[in-house]
Every structure is written in structure tokens, then in C-alpha cells.
Amino acid sequence: SDLAFGHLAYEVDDIYALCAHLQAQGVTINRPPRDGRMAFVRTPDNISVELLQHGDALPVAEPWASMPNTGKW
């Protein structure tokens, strides 16, 4: 049977640092962490991955706060 799922999710220690690292490696940030709490990226295998800030959201910061969504997640 075919298994289907919407996305994977990971809790991370510093969502801004991880998103910056992934972006530097050429990963598209589909939904930037504008709120300091949540982001979505898409893997080269077309899997949507949700990143969640561990604990409280980080303070809202640029460049993330004004970055638009890219594609879909």
C-alpha cells in the first residue's frame, strides 16, 4: 500500500541560524520564520519539512520578518 503524509516536523534550537545555514546551502525557505517560531522548507526529494523553534519563539527579526513565502509547503 502507498503511505502518504503531509510533512515532517523537527524542533530546533535556533530557527534563524538553521534557516540561514540551509539557505546558504541552496535550500529554498518556502515559509520563512517570520514569527520566530515556525518555518517550512522543501527537500530536494520534494518533501515538506516544518521547523519549529524549541521553547519560546525568538524575537521577530530581519531578514525573516519581511521575507515573502516561496512556492508551497
Kindly label every feature range from the protein language model.
Residues A9-E11, R42:
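Short hydrophobic/aromatic beta-strand micro-patches
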